[in-house]
Swiss-Prot record:
Enriched expression in the embryonic and larval nervous systems. Strongly expressed in two large neurons that project over all the lobes of the mushroom bodies. One of its GO terms (cellular component) is extracellular space. Residues 155-180 are annotated as: Disordered. Residues 33-35, 152-180 form a propeptide. The lineage of its organism: Eukaryota, Metazoa, Ecdysozoa, Arthropoda, Hexapoda. This is Amnesiac neuropeptides. Disruption phenotype: Increased growth of the perineurial glial layer of the larval peripheral nerve. It comes from Drosophila melanogaster (Fruit fly). The gene is amn. It comes from the Eukaryota. GO terms for molecular function: neuropeptide hormone activity. The keyword Secreted applies. Residues 1-32 form the signal peptide.
Length: 180
């Protein structure tokens, strides 16, 4: 069972890191693209670009609302011509309205990633992953996390005593000869 855990845990951590990397990579690329367009211009031009982004997102919201009202209006009328026009209206709205993610609060959630994305747009973001280490028997402090990392754990199992003078059974004869 121990060998299974030793193989499974690093594979799970690696898979988790890969998934996190691709998620943040896509988010950073979209955010960096928007930032690159705005940062290319200075002063009032950048402010105008930000306003244009806001107007585009507002117009997308309005089109989505029009689609919803159109769908509700024609929901109860089911004859052939109206259903065809409804399908055309829905397809038109679906083509024109493409939801885009909003990254306005993204810097609050992951400020380190924002700095890396701004500095390293060519090579992509640098993912900084951290997780709690296992509690050590010397510190006598329990972590509040139910699952902890294997980093920092001793190679000797915790049930076996350490080499000490108080417990002579734990010492091998060769070590006893070296200590004298």
């Amino acid at each position: 069972m121990r060998s299974f855990c030793c193989c499974f845990y690093p594979a799970a951590v690696a898979l988790h890191c890969v998934l996190l990397f691709y998620t943040f990579f896509l988010l950073f690329r979209a955010s960096a693209l928007r930032r690159r367009v705005v940062s290319g211009s200075k002063g009032s031009a950048a402010l105008a670009l930000c306003r244009q982004f806001e107007q585009l997102s507002a117009s997308r919201r309005e089109r989505a609302e029009e689609c919803r009202t159109t769908q509700l209006r024609y929901h109860y009328h089911r004859n052939g011509a109206q259903s065809r026009s409804l399908c055309a209206a829905v397809l038109c709205c679906k083509r024109s309205y493409i939801p885009r993610p909003n990254f306005s609060c993204f810097s609050l959630v992951f400020p380190v990633g924002q700095r890396f994305a701004a500095a390293r747009t060519r090579f992509g973001p640098t993912l900084v992953a951290s997780w709690p280490l296992c509690n050590d028997s010397e510190t006598k402090v329990l972590t509040k996390w139910p699952s902890c990392s294997l980093i920092g754990r001793r190679s000797v199992p915790r049930g076996q005593p350490k080499f000490s003078r108080e417990n002579p059974r734990a010492l091998s004869p060769s070590l006893l000869g070296e200590m004298r």
